[in-house]
Amino acid sequence: MNAAIFRFFFYFST
């Protein structure tokens, strides 16, 4: 689940 949150944040941060 950590990877999902990280990717989600990264995707939104981009």
UniProtKB/Swiss-Prot annotation:
Biological process, per Gene Ontology: regulation of DNA-templated transcription
Keyword entries, A-Z: Leader peptide
InterPro entries: PheM
Name of the protein this chain belongs to: Phenylalanine--tRNA ligase operon leader peptide
Native organism taxonomy: Bacteria, Pseudomonadati, Pseudomonadota, Gammaproteobacteria, Enterobacterales
This protein's encoding gene: pheM
